């Protein structure tokens, strides 16, 4: 059994410098807000307050502010729960900073997203490497999705996951306060993605040990292998493991030959011989190019430049010839550099 971590919340670990760093991290891309500027303008004072809240165990979570959005990528309705900047968001960052290096070391290598250095590009390179170097064990793919992953991870499950990893009672109490501040993992909390990854640690281990290659991006995951029957038999183990955490798979899981259908994940479709852009993303690209031709703005120039830069990751020669003909990159850069 892996040794549990202790002595996390101590005078030596929770320093004013750590609290200042946490406040600055929490303030990124929010510096125009009055509530954030007020804290940054009195950084020393607020860092001392934050330190005492954590060391004394007097932190109490505030109510969340609910916000409704439509996710442009998937066109799904999302409900965000925004915590107050101080003390809540700052406490969340301190809580993760205290254990981040040791937590990262325990997470699965290919459990990606919301971890610095492990984004879409990291996942893309991993899948491409497997397909290019191991054709035998990438013949079939099992593609699944965990149903309402964040909504179904409950506070008691988060608490149990941390108790297996950490024995410091003060730190466990802090984590439980954050976890029990909502009925599930709220979209909008910095801690939510870390909590999810820790809860799914045993699940990741099971998948990794029973398949040739495994990758999980938030709640979507793929398992690759040479035998279709083995992948199908693995479904029962996966379902039982998830059930222990109060989770279950969507019914639209798929087992298919990679060469015939391609692996649709991370915004691409992967084949052994090439990679294509996902159809939905290609449509967004075409619309962006069409809007640019109709009316040129700095925002549209930046959006189009970003998508053009992304073409190096997939087979895009025919796409560029058909939909980007006549678009001048120098003109795009000139518009993108404008402030308004």
Regions found by a protein language model. Name each.
Residues 1-48, 52:
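Non-catalytic, polymerase-adjacent accessory regions of viral genome-replication enzymes
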Residues 43-77:
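Active-site-flanking structural segment that lines cofactor/substrate pockets
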Residues 50, 54-58, 234-245:
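Inter-domain linker/hinge segments that demarcate the starts of reverse transcriptase
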Residues 1-9, 96-154:
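Active-site-proximal segment of RNA-dependent polymerases
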Residues 125-218, 222-239, 256-262, 298-332:
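Conserved polymerase palm-domain catalytic core
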Residues 62-64, 215-219, 252:
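Short Gly/Ser/Thr- and Asp/Glu-enriched loop/turn motifs at secondary-structure junctions
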Residues 245-309:
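A conserved non-catalytic segment of reverse transcriptases
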Residues 29-37, 65-90, 106-118, 177-197:
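Short, conserved non-catalytic motifs in the polymerase core
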């Amino acid at each position: 059994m892996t040794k549990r971590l202790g002595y996390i919340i101590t005078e030596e670990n929770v320093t004013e410098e750590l609290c200042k760093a946490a406040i600055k991290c929490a303030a990124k891309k929010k510096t125009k807000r009055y509530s954030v500027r007020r804290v940054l303008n009195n950084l020393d004072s607020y860092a001392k307050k934050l330190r005492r809240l954590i060391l004394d165990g007097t932190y109490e979570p505030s109510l969340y502010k609910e916000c409704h959005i439509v996710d442009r990528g998937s066109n799904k309705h999302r409900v965000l729960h925004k915590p107050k900047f101080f003390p809540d968001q700052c406490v969340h960052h301190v809580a993760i900073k205290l254990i981040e290096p040791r937590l990262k070391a325990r997470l699965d290598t290919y459990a990606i997203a919301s971890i610095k250095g492990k984004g879409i590009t990291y996942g893309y390179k991993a899948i491409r490497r497997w397909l290019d170097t191991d054709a035998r064990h990438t013949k079939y793919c099992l593609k699944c999705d965990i149903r309402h992953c964040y909504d179904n991870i409950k506070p008691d499950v988060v608490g149990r996951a941390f108790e297996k990893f950490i024995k410091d009672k003060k730190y466990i109490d802090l984590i439980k306060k954050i976890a029990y501040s909502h009925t599930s993992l709220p979209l909008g909390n910095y801690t939510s993605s870390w909590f999810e990854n820790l809860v799914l640690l045993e699940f990741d281990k099971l998948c990794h040990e029973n398949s040739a290659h495994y990758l999980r991006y938030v709640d979507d995951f793929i398992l690759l292998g040479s035998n279709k029957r083995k992948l199908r038999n693995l479904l029962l183990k996966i379902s039982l493991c998830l059930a222990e955490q109060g989770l279950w798979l969507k019914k639209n899981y798929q087992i298919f030959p990679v060469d015939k259908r391609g692996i649709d994940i991370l915004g691409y479709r992967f084949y052994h011989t090439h990679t294509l852009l996902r159809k939905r993303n290609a449509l967004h690209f075409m619309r962006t190019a069409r809007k640019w031709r109709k009316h040129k703005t700095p925002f549209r120039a930046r959006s189009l430049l970003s998508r053009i830069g992304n073409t190096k990751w997939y087979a895009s020669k025919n796409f560029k010839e058909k939909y980007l003909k006549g678009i001048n990159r120098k003109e795009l850069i000139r518009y993108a550099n404008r402030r308004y």
